[in-house]
Amino acid sequence: MNTYRTAIIGYGRMAHGHAKAYQEVGLPLVAVADISEEALARFRDQFGQRQMYTDYRQMLDEVHPDIISVVTHDQLHCPMVVDAAERGVKGIVCEKPMAMTLKEADRMLTACRLSGTQLTISHQRYYTPQYAQARELLSSGAVGAVRSAEAYLLPSCIHTDGTHTIHMLLSLLSNPRVLHLLAQVDGHSGHVYYGHRVEDAGVAFIAFEQGIHAHLNWGLASHQPRTPLHPSPDFRYHGFIIHGETGRLELDGDGPVGDRPILRIVRGTEIEAVNLRPGKSSIRLEIEDLVSSIETGAPHPLSGQNGRDVLEVIIGIYESARRRRVIQFPFEVKENPFLAMCEAGDFPS
């Protein structure tokens, strides 16, 4: 593996994992940029002195990193990715969600295509053992042909955290083409998350090719007291049930619930626990695949186009809620329908 000089834009909570992963892969981390001097001092305390910047463009112009991580609020992903691509960065790890709108996502993809930059969107749970083995089991026919799926998210919104839920649902189903969806969201509380308004709860029905359909359920029925929309959320952060012809696969998300196996196959009254393999850091594996994509040109499992596909489902959910109708795929919506609904006063408190 060649040596690539790396840098990080935005040093918040998630950025520590990126910095550690670069060290584990053996790539020199040469610079970090953040508008907060306090954040830069925290990085220095954790990883030692590097080139420090409060202006990310200045860092890109002076350091010329080969690979960067964009670990900032959602609204900043597009301009930062475009600026890096236009300056010749070879690889970009962009935190999820990809962007605020499909227009921004398309701008990012175009900039990276023109510069030859490999872009990956950090849906890193793709690499964790329970999700990787769940994909393998479904692909091998462990429950027969897949017919339907249930996906759950607690407590957050479909855009900022549910992007993981959508991504994992699509990957568990082998990325089928979306035909149409119908959805509704509740945004009455005015909750702000990572710098922008988000919904409190929502539901969606998605129809895929090959006759597969999925139901999504996320968020809170109330904040005080905190009451989940789903009456019995026995999962950790995300939860999935995949129904097949001969059984179902159940996945409890990011951690076990009580003594129950986190991943299991259910056939009638029989429950088969799946033993999980040891796993490496998911961000480390994402970066290793990015290096491989840079050197071989092979598509990354978490490519920018894959990230756009996930964002299209999210925007479709918001557009269905705004228009109160079924949304056929593909569609042309360049704004963020949820934010448009907020600006129009569609969510009275």
Task: Walk through the language-model features, giving the residues of each.
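Rossmann-like dinucleotide-binding domain that binds NAD(P)(H)
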Residues: 147-237, 243, 305
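NAD(P)-dinucleotide binding in Rossmann-like oxidoreductases
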Residues: 194, 210-286, 303
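Short, Asp-centered acidic motifs that coordinate Mg2+ and/or phosphate
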Residues: 31, 51, 67, 91, ...
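Conserved SAM-binding strand-loop segment of SAM-dependent methyltransferases
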Residues: 49-56
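C-terminal helix-rich "cap/oligomerization" subdomain common to oxidoreductases
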Residues: 1, 27, 67-70, 106, ...
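Beta-strand-loop-alpha-helix segment that lines the small-molecule cofactor/substrate pocket
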Residues: 62, 66-67, 73, 78-126
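N-terminal Rossmann-like dinucleotide-binding module
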Residues: 1-47, 169
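Rossmann-like NAD(P)H-binding beta-loop-alpha module
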Residues: 128-148
